[in-house]
Amino acid sequence: MNNIQIRNYQPGDFQQLCAIFIRAVTMTASQHYSPQQISAWAQIDESRWKEKLAKSQVWVAIINAQPVGFISRIEHYIDMLFVDPEYTRRGVASALLKPLIKSESELTVDASITAKPFFERYGFQTVKQQRVECRGAWFTNFYMRYKPQH
């Protein structure tokens, strides 16, 4: 496994995080969603994203001095977790999620079909299946909750 370092988001990361998001949606999530859905999802409104990231706690996974994934949290809600497809199945998403699981009493996420098994491996449970609209396309996702077992 590569040496993964986790650090706080820096404004200079913005374009690389956008690229990771686009690649993750178009290459990884395309296994579970139609071309129309991917086209609707894989768009970035830069001003909205910058505003969202400013309101969030964001951590970036670094391998060989390059951002390869990121996670963002607003209070107890995981808003985004994306890994560059070149680095999937190498522990990047786990390295981003594990510190949150250790530090939070509860976490929630709206997980894609693609991400649902990953979150289940860490003890997240599906609260409900949802149909959500994004730019005219309808998606299935899952509202999931994590509570530590005591």
Swiss-Prot record:
GO annotation (BP), single: SOS response
Signals that turn on the gene: By SOS response. A member of the dinB-yafNOP operon.
Pfam short name (any one): Acetyltransf_10
Highest taxon, organism lineage: Bacteria
InterPro entries, A to Z: Acyl_CoA_acyltransferase (IPR016181), GNAT_dom (IPR000182), N-acetyltrans/Recomb-assoc (IPR052564)
Key words of the record: Acyltransferase, DNA damage, DNA repair, SOS response, Transferase
The protein's Enzyme Commission number: 2.3.1.-
The N-acetyltransferase domain, residue ranges: 4-149
MF term (GO), any: acyltransferase activity, transferring groups other than amino-acyl groups
PROSITE patterns named in the record: GNAT (PS51186)
NCBIfam families assigned: PRK09831.1 (NF007338)
Family statement: Belongs to the acetyltransferase family.
Protein name, per record: Uncharacterized N-acetyltransferase YafP
